[in-house]
């Protein structure tokens, strides 16, 4: 079994490609099940966010695994494999695990150290677990990765004052207008990104904020937190006519701000308008950028502002990379030890069988034993067995991560009289449990 990651992100693919390869939340479970049915795929988790679509899989062979992951992606999004292949990356084994640690801790994000990705990875794992597309390896890996990322954010504080996409949006507005005093802003969407934008706008001098959302109650909840107004979704263009700055972040699958409508609007509008689209797929038609006085920015346009990270935070990243390498080594040592689990179980079962035979013999030879005495003798005998096996089992685990592990394990089985049949029976039981 091998761990293989395939994906595309803000490093490898522009936004016009990424927005075509996003798994809809309503289709997550179906995508997981469909991928699980592909040849070579033993386990899988799909992570799909505004900046990345990645699949973490356990495969029986690397080469065939790569092919079937690509085929699944092409079939799911109804695109030619040759069209998406140039934007894909692959990580195998240690590189795949290392990458997942960095992603979950926010070290690979457009926003260094951001915490949103931790929740997204955790959500992706929970959905996969509920859908039964994870097993022994990915269950262990994702639990370790999520725990590590939580510790990173708690102990290093890398997320404190982290430059966010929403922060970058506000900085772009300041560069265009200078002071934001008396500027009118319209937020289209009432999700997490809109809330982050409002937090960054606090204290910037903007007093006139209108929130527009298809579900009005969500807009009202957000407006109450930030003393903003609520506008009717059906009257969006009327609000845009009065706006200086528009920030758009919705989960719509298609653009909600169209070029034709904006062309008419800008011909009537007396002033310029800054429109920042942080949706993925994009919420504003790209052709709007050609309209005079319509200043359009998308997520990739904000990357330059976001990349201005402090030296202190970059120092933390270097330190974390060493820690991550140690975590990765620990994971693969654990994986190697999985191979001796059937041997350990076979050894324990053989010892318990011997105990049972001995207790039966004792009962026959000492019929006068009370039930309490019989139970006490059994407990003491089991304790002796556990003490006797503790050191050999510990040594076996150590041997399992050494170069000549196979030879050492065979010697161990011979010493304790464990046949191939003893071990194979346990292995079959484990396989049936996983399936």
UniProtKB/Swiss-Prot annotation:
Keywords: NADP, Oxidoreductase, Porphyrin biosynthesis. Pathway: Porphyrin-containing compound metabolism; protoporphyrin-IX biosynthesis; 5-aminolevulinate from L-glutamyl-tRNA(Glu): step 1/2. Pfam families: GlutR_dimer (PF00745), GlutR_N (PF05201), Shikimate_DH (PF01488). Substrate binds at residues 49-52, 109, 114-116, 120. One of its GO terms (molecular function) is NADP binding. The active site is at 50 (nucleophile). GO terms for biological process: protoporphyrinogen IX biosynthetic process. The record marks 99 as: Important for activity. NADP(+) binds at residues 189-194. It is an enzyme of class 1 (oxidoreductase). Its EC number is 1.2.1.70. It catalyses: (S)-4-amino-5-oxopentanoate + tRNA(Glu) + NADP(+) = L-glutamyl-tRNA(Glu) + NADPH + H(+). The keyword Oxidoreductase applies. Belongs to the glutamyl-tRNA reductase family. During catalysis, the active site Cys acts as a nucleophile attacking the alpha-carbonyl group of tRNA-bound glutamate with the formation of a thioester intermediate between enzyme and glutamate, and the concomitant release of tRNA(Glu). The thioester intermediate is finally reduced by direct hydride transfer from NADPH, to form the product GSA. Catalyzes the NADPH-dependent reduction of glutamyl-tRNA(Glu) to glutamate 1-semialdehyde (GSA). Possesses an unusual extended V-shaped dimeric structure with each monomer consisting of three distinct domains arranged along a curved 'spinal' alpha-helix. The N-terminal catalytic domain specifically recognizes the glutamate moiety of the substrate. The second domain is the NADPH-binding domain, and the third C-terminal domain is responsible for dimerization. Homodimer. PANTHER family: GLUTAMYL-TRNA REDUCTASE 1, CHLOROPLASTIC. This is Glutamyl-tRNA reductase. It comes from Listeria monocytogenes serotype 4b (strain F2365). The lineage of its organism: Bacteria, Bacillati, Bacillota, Bacilli, Bacillales. The gene is hemA.
């Amino acid at each position: 079994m091998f761990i293989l990651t395939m994906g595309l992100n803000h490093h490898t693919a522009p936004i016009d490609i990424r927005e075509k390869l996003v798994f809809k939340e309503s289709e997550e479970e179906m995508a997981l099940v469909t991928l699980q049915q592909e040849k070579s795929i033993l386990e899988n988790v799909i992570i799909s966010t505004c900046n990345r679509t990645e699949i973490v899989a356990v495969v029986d062979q690397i080469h065939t695994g790569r092919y079937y992951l690509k085929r699944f992606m092409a079939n799911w999004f109804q695109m030619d494999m040759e069209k998406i292949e140039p934007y894909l990356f692959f990580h195998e084994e240690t590189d795949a695990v290392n990458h997942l640690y960095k992603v979950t801790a926010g070290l690979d994000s457009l926003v260094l150290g951001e915490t949103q990705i931790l929740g997204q990875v955790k959500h992706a794992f929970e959905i996969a677990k509920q859908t039964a597309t994870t097993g022994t390896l990915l269950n262990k890996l994702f639990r370790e990765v999520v725990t590590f990322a939580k510790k990173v954010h708690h102990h290093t504080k890398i997320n404190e004052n982290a430059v966010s996409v929403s922060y970058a949006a506000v900085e772009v507005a300041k560069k265009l207008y200078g002071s934001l005093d008396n500027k009118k802003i319209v937020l289209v969407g009432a999700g997490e990104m809109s809330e982050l934008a409002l937090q960054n706008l606090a204290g910037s001098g903007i007093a006139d904020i209108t929130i527009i959302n298809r579900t009005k109650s969500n807009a009202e909840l957000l407006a109450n937190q930030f003393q903003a107004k609520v506008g009717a979704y059906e009257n969006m263009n009327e609000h845009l006519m009065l706006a200086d700055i528009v920030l758009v972040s919705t989960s719509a699958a298609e653009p909600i701000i169209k070029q034709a409508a904006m062309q008419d609007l800008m011909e009537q509008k007396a002033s310029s308008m800054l429109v920042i689209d942080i949706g993925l797929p994009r919420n504003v038609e790209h052709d709007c950028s050609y309209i005079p006085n319509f200043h359009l920015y998308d997520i990739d346009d904000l990357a330059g502002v976001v990349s201005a990270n402090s030296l202190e935070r970059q120092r933390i990243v270097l330190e974390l990379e060493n820690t991550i390498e140690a975590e990765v080594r620990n994971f693969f040592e654990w994986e190697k030890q999985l191979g001796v689990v059937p041997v350990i179980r076979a050894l324990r079962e053989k010892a318990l069988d011997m105990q049972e035979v001995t207790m039966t013999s004792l009962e026959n030879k000492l019929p006068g034993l009370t039930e309490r005495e019989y139970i006490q003798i059994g407990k003491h005998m089991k304790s002796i067995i556990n003490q006797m096996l503790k050191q050999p089992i510990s040594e076996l685990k150590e041997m399992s991560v050494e170069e000549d592990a196979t030879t050492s394990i065979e010697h161990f089985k011979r010493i304790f009289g464990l046949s191939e049949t003893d071990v194979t029976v346990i292995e079959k039981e484990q396989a049936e449990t996983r399936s």
